Every structure is written in structure tokens, then in C-alpha cells.
């Protein structure tokens, strides 16, 4: 495994796709991040698709329709369309029930592809294990390589469950193993995630590409803090720590509230909507803030559009990411791009997203007193001293860089797939059996 942007992994000389089919079964790239199942993955799928289209690559994204008002085909931008596939009831279907609808979703994907001429897609990229299950079948049917991004793994999540959170079911871990075995290439966010795939799922390191996610550097920029606070109705003189994301135990907004209770002059802004179980609704957090005696120091905002999210980042002195696990942490990079330092849990990909002691600080605990101590230290050092370094660090994560690396991974997958086809022909001529994903057999 290696960074797909390493000189040895340059896309120069590798075949490049003309058209890519992208699968995102459980959440639409057009959904508002910060609520339900919509989060960083939605942003990743949409932004990489838009950047691919800028390079002349056509992208079709398949997702499950969740409303009768969803149009079958939505044109997002030149070269990017979203296909809303009808699979099961539009509403009221929990993500854990979606495996029952994978046959219906797969049928919808295959029928859509059948409207094109044979060989229309050059590659298929699935996101999350549910999509991987569909992608495994579709890739075999279309005779194209399957590239898969897990985003999260059941074994990792279950090893870092928050109090009140629901463990991932065994069928997910089984499904993830199947997809790891069947995919031609695996895209991961960090080297740490690559090591997890190898240790937990015995993935072949040679089939793994490390591709860091990006940030929209034209949208997320430093700006006037006073103006941002005025727009949000926040005290211009307050010391503000912001939390942005889905309100669910995994994201641990309760840890931030408990830490704030130990910092008498800190105001907390929480921007996000409900997701998951346990301490998973704004109402529950409102109740917790009341119990802690800090209700008057906490402001709750609904999920924000990108333009409004920029104001939240700019308004904050610090953005907190106390998650129990993050495969990367796009919120951390977006905040730093706005010149706001980040205090984050030292888990998953966050040590890559945040430069400890330079663009923010990492906390090696989820205990409120440890968080209060680190937040206090950053305030004492003056958060603005981290601002320039935060912007510089975020500048290394652009969607252009991400897609450069992604195209390298795609090129490797296509080249290997073509080589397999050559071996398949040779094997047939010699009377030997051949599996596209297992090689020549006696």
C-alpha cells in the first residue's frame, strides 16, 4: 500500500476512464450533510464526481430514492448525473434494513446500465459496504473493475462504541469481508485505515491506494469573525467552541458539553441534526446542557448549507471534533481552511487531518477533564496563533489533489483488469480455468 500520489504511483502512462459508475446506496450525495445518514461521505462522493467531470470524465451516481418526489435522473453539473433508484419504501426504512433491498437496488442499477451501449462504463466505484455488495455483482456483469471505499468498518466502530450506541450487526462485517475480497482496488483515506484493512480483513496491501479527501478551498476560506458572529447572533466577545456534524453517540458532542461545564467562560455552538441512537437528538443534548447548568452557554443550530457552514467555522475560536472514531474528519479540514484551529480526538484519520501543536491539538482521551484541559491550553495560547498554520495545512487537502490520486487508483485497476482479461484468454486456450479475481487455476 502507498500513497496514490507517490512518484512511483503517478497516473502518467496508466489508462484513464471515460465514464465512471458510482454507487452510494444508503445516502444521496445531494442530501444535506449533518443529519440522518448524510455526512462526510456525501461530500466526498459529490466533490470527487464534480472534479472528475472537470477532467472530462463522465460520472453517473446511483443512490436509493427516499422520496416520491425524487426525479429518476438529476443533472447535477455538466458530466455528472444522479440516478435515484427505487428500492423499497421511500421513507421509514432504517439503514440496518437496507440489506433487504439490495436485490431491488441491484436490479435498478443493471436496468439503467442496459439503456446504454455495451461497455459504457470503464470502472465502478462503490462507497460503503452496502454499495460494495451491489458493485461486486454489477462489476462482474459489466466486466469492469470494481474500486471500493469503505469509509468506515464495522470492526473499528464496534471497538470504539460510545455509551448508548448500537453495535454494528455481524452481517455488516461479513459483507465487508466479501467486498474486500472481491474488489480490484481499495481506496482508503489514510495509512492507518490501510493497516486496519490488512489486519482486520487480510486485504492485499498491493491492492490498496491511500487517497486523502479534500476540501473546497474556494468556499472554505478565512473571513471576518465579527461579521460571522453577528450573522449568527453570537456574542462578539465570547470564547466560542463549535461542534459541526451529525448528533450521534459516535460523534460525541456530549463530551464537548461536559468539558464546557468545566470551563466557565466558554460558549458552545452545536450545528447538526439527529442521527443514530442514544444521545442522538438535539433535544437530548438540550436536556444534558440543562443538567450540566450550561444551557445559557450553548447555542443549537440546524444542519447548515456550505455557505452558512463557513460562517459557523469563522465565528468559532476553536472547532472541536471529539468523535470516538473518524476515518478522516472533513469537518476538521474545512474548519482549518477557514483559519480556525481544531481540537480533535486522536483517533482514526484525525491525526492526519490535524497537525498536533501546529494547526490545533489532539486529545488522547474522551474524558471531559482532558478535553477541558486541552481546550483551555489552546485558549491560553491564543487560538489566532494557530490560524495561519491551520490555513496552510488545509491547503494541502484539495479535491484536485484527491482526484489526481483517485485517477491513479482507477488507472491501476483498469490496467490490472486488462491484464487479467489477457490471462483469461490464454487460460481458456490452454484448457485451464480462470477467475477474474482469483487468477489462473489448474
Swiss-Prot record:
Keywords: Glycosyltransferase, Magnesium, Metal-binding, Transferase. One of its GO terms (biological process) is mycothiol biosynthetic process. 1D-myo-inositol 3-phosphate binds at residues 26, 37-42, 95, 128, 152, 172. The lineage of its organism: Bacteria, Bacillati, Actinomycetota, Actinomycetes, Mycobacteriales. SUPFAM superfamilies: UDP-Glycosyltransferase/glycogen phosphorylase. It holds the Pfam family Glyco_trans_4_4. The keyword Glycosyltransferase applies. Transmembrane segments: none annotated. InterPro entries: Glyco_trans_1, Glyco_trans_4-like_N, Mycothiol_biosynthesis_MshA. One of its GO terms (molecular function) is magnesium ion binding. Belongs to the glycosyltransferase group 1 family. MshA subfamily. UDP-N-acetyl-alpha-D-glucosamine binds at residues 32-33, 40, 246, 251, 304, 326, 334. Its EC number is 2.4.1.250. Catalyzes the transfer of a N-acetyl-glucosamine moiety to 1D-myo-inositol 3-phosphate to produce 1D-myo-inositol 2-acetamido-2-deoxy-glucopyranoside 3-phosphate in the mycothiol biosynthesis pathway. It catalyses: 1D-myo-inositol 3-phosphate + UDP-N-acetyl-alpha-D-glucosamine = 1D-myo-inositol 2-acetamido-2-deoxy-alpha-D-glucopyranoside 3-phosphate + UDP + H(+). Mg(2+) binds at residues 313-314, 316, 340. This is D-inositol 3-phosphate glycosyltransferase. PANTHER family: D-INOSITOL 3-PHOSPHATE GLYCOSYLTRANSFERASE (PTHR12526:SF510), GLYCOSYLTRANSFERASE (PTHR12526). Homodimer.
Amino acid at each position: 500500500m502507498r500513497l496514490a500520489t507517490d512518484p512511483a504511483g503517478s497516473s502518467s502512462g496508466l489508462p484513464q476512464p471515460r465514464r465512471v459508475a458510482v454507487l452510494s446506496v444508503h445516502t444521496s450525495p445531494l442530501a444535506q450533510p449533518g443529519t440522518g445518514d448524510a455526512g462526510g461521505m456525501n461530500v466526498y462522493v459529490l466533490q470527487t464526481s464534480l472534479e472528475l467531470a472537470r477532467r472530462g470524465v463522465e460520472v453517473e451516481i446511483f443512490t436509493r430514492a427516499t422520496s416520491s418526489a425524487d426525479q429518476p435522473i438529476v443533472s447535477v453539473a455538466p458530466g455528472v448525473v444522479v440516478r435515484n433508484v427505487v428500492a423499497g419504501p421511500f421513507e421509514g426504512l432504517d439503514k440496518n434494513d437496507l440489506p433487504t433491498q439490495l436485490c431491488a437496488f441491484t436490479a435498478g442499477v443493471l436496468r439503467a446500465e442496459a439503456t446504454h451501449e455495451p461497455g459504457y462504463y470503464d470502472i465502478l466505484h462503490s462507497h460503503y459496504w452496502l454499495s460494495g455488495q451491489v458493485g461486486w455483482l454489477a462489476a462482474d456483469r459489466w466486466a469492469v473493475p470494481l474500486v471500493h471505499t469503505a469509509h468506515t468498518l464495522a470492526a473499528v466502530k464496534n471497538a470504539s462504541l460510545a455509551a448508548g450506541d448500537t453495535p454494528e450487526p455481524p452481517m455488516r462485517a461479513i459483507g465487508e469481508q466479501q467486498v474486500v475480497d472481491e474488489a480490484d482496488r481499495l481506496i482508503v483515506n489514510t495509512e492507518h485505515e490501510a493497516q486496519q484493512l490488512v489486519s482486520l480483513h487480510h486485504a492485499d496491501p498491493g491492492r490498496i491506494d491511500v487517497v486523502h479527501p479534500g476540501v473546497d478551498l474556494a468556499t472554505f476560506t478565512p473571513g471576518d469573525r465579527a461579521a460571522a458572529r453577528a450573522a449568527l447572533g453570537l456574542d462578539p466577545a465570547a470564547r466560542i467552541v463549535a461542534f459541526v456534524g451529525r448528533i450521534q453517540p459516535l460523534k460525541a458532542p456530549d463530551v464537548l458539553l461536559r468539558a464546557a461545564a468545566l470551563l466557565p467562560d466558554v460558549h458552545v455552538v452545536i450545528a447538526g441534526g439527529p442521527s443514530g441512537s442514544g444521545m442522538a437528538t438535539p433535544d437530548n443534548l438540550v436536556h444534558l446542557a440543562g443538567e450540566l447548568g450550561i444551557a445559557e452557554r450553548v447555542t443549537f443550530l440546524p444542519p447548515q448549507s456550505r455557505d452558512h457552514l463557513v460562517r459557523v467555522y469563522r465565528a468559532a475560536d476553536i472547532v472541536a471534533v471529539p468523535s470516538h472514531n473518524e476515518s478522516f474528519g472533513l469537518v476538521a479540514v474545512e474548519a482549518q481552511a477557514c483559519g480556525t484551529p481544531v481540537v480533535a480526538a486522536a483517533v482514526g484519520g484525525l491525526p492526519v487531518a490535524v497537525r498536533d501543536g501546529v494547526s490545533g491539538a489532539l486529545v488522547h482521551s474522551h474524558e471531559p477533564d482532558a478535553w477541558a484541559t486541552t481546550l483551555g491550553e489552546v485558549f491560553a495560547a491564543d487560538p489566532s496563533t494557530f490560524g495561519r498554520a491551520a490555513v496552510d495545512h488545509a491547503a494541502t487537502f484539495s479535491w484536485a489533489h484527491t482526484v489526481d490520486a483517485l485517477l491513479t487508483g482507477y488507472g491501476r485497476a483498469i490496467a490490472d483488469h486488462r491484464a487479467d482479461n489477457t490471462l483469461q484468454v490464454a487460460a481458456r486456450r490452454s484448457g485451464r480455468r480462470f477467475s477474474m479475481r482469483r487468477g489462473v487455476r489448474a
